[in-house]
Amino acid sequence: MPTKKQKSKSKLKPFFALVRRTNPSYGKLAFALALSVVTTLVSLLIPLLTKQLVDGFSMSNLSGTQIGLIALVFFVQAGLSAYATYALNYNGQKIISGLRELLWKKLIKLPVSYFDTNASGETVSRVTNDTMVVKELITTHISGFITGIISVIGSLTILFIMNWKLTLLVLVVVPLAALILVPIGRKMFSISRETQDETARFTGLLNQILPEIRLVKASNAEDVEYGRGKMGISSLFKLGVREAKVQSLVGPLISLVLMAALVAVIGYGGMQVSSGELTAGALVAFILYLFQIIMPMGQITTFFTQLQKSIGATERMIEILAEEEEDTVTGKQIENAHLPIQLDRVSFGYKPDQLILKEVSAVIEAGKVTAIVGPSGGGKTTLFKLLERFYSPTAGTIRLGDEPVDTYSLESWREHIGYVSQESPLMSGTIRENICYGLERDVTDAEIEKAAEMAYALNFIKELPNQFDTEVGERGIMLSGGQRQRIAIARALLRNPSILMLDEATSSLDSQSEKSVQQALEVLMEGRTTIVIAHRLSTVVDADQLLFVEKGEITGRGTHHELMASHGLYRDFAEQQLKMNADLENKAG
């Protein structure tokens, strides 16, 4: 069974391993720590110089050299302390920058499945809050611990040399302070750990609600979300109060111990001064050294508390860094993407015992339009995720021509796919940046304008004050739904994909926007292998092939007319769409 010491080492090992992964400058870090040590050693001279000053104090004996020496020591200590603090903070920031870069690089390369199962707010908290915990340890508490140890040992050594009897009295204070501070430190760690977790949860809640504030307002759900947020705030408040209660004990208890020690030293030391066994200067030095023993005890205790917090933060960061990355480069390059896509008995479930798709087989012809229709929850969107290779089939194979798609690199596969989703998400930035998003090559203004023109987006872009340099806002909120879709179509046109995947959403647009988007889509679909989750009857009627997906299975395939004659559920779908179109026309009339 591992001992307490072995457990402590096993917990520290991952922490130091993580710090090493940031490639810190050990020389600069050692130099900064060495400066802190020198600062502490210099501070140990001050009580001795004060002793000499007090013992030889008289107006006639007061020399400028003595005063100058004490002043010099003070200035040297202050200067070294300032530079050591800066150097430690600089190195700490470099390490944290390296940690954040490691985490960011990992997060960007993690598969979609990770983000489907982990709240984005909690992940953000790991990159921001947890790294700050480690930074505080490196920049403040490690140096405080080392200098604290040196200060305590150095002070006690000097005191023993000066007067061993009085030093024994001081030594009683050290274990007494430890008995008080160590349990408080453990309690602080427990509360801090809970606070970190609660902060991550609260950050997750904010990231969930604020991006969807329009839905909140449209649903009159402000009070509901206020209640959820208030619960998180209340939990953080309670943890803050618990932390304040513990912290409120530290200062008074240290003061109590210090005052008790001070009274004992002054009382016993005063007796020795009266008997001539101790000089007045030595007693003053004793009192100053007493402060240099008690105060670092608090630093040492805080170090262990912060170390425990950092170990907890490290464990969570290591969990992210241990996740398997999505390999985008291994595999062949696609030389010809104008080939049929074949689904051969494809099954998939997010959980092994709950299949969403069950032995789906189909051929998506190259250069033609395949429309996927069916009731909600049938598996249409999941099928898209498999085709994009966000997930791999649980069973079965997806092929391009005769080759399984997983023999091609993800990078090559996704280069040949253009995806226009229902939401048509845009990144914060300009219209130009969004149209060129993801392209590694340089794109000319003429190419951007041509893509925008083909997407029926050029006219509205030209009407904007800054045209292509117009900021679209967070998630493209400054643009309308139809404008966002046309920007997404322009982006897809610029990529010039062989395979187009479209999750149709024109039903949510006004008639003019719908017409513009439909025209843009027709241009985009021309000559490409197109797979569309269809909601509009016009798309279905014009498609070369329909796949009717329900309950994870393809229950019908063929043209619109063939399915109207043979598939009852499809016929209901088509008639419902016809009725909706007629209602819209009547309203428009």
UniProtKB/Swiss-Prot annotation:
UniProt note on regulation of activity: 50% inhibited by vanadate; it has been suggested that vanadate fully inhibits the dimer but not the monomer. Activated by 15 uM reserpine then inhibited by higher concentrations.
Enzyme class: translocase
Function description: An efflux transporter able to transport Hoechst 33342, ethidium bromide, doxorubicin and a number of other drugs in vitro into inside out vesicles. The endogenous substrate is unknown. It has been suggested that NBD dimerization induced by ATP-binding causes a large conformational change responsible for substrate translocation. Transmembrane domains (TMD) form a pore in the inner membrane and the ATP-binding domain (NBD) is responsible for energy generation.
Xref: CDD domains: ABC_6TM_LmrA_like
Gene3D superfamilies documented for this protein: ABC transporter type 1, transmembrane domain (1.20.1560.10), P-loop containing nucleotide triphosphate hydrolases (3.40.50.300)
Membrane-protein topology: Multi-pass membrane protein
Gene that encodes the chain: bmrA
Natural source organism: Bacillus subtilis (strain 168)
Result of changing K380R: Retains 2% ATPase activity; unable to transport Hoechst 33342. Traps ADP in a beryllium fluoride-dependent manner, confirming ATPase activity. Probably unable to undergo NBD dimerization
Gene Ontology CC annotations of this record: plasma membrane
pH note: Optimum pH is 8.0.
Any one GO BP annotation for this protein: response to antibiotic
Protein's recorded name: Multidrug resistance ABC transporter ATP-binding/permease protein BmrA
Subunit structure: Homodimer.
Origin superkingdom: Bacteria
Membership in a protein family: Belongs to the ABC transporter superfamily.
Result of knocking out the encoding gene: Not essential.
Chain residues that bind ATP: G374, P375, S376, G377, G378, G379, K380, T381
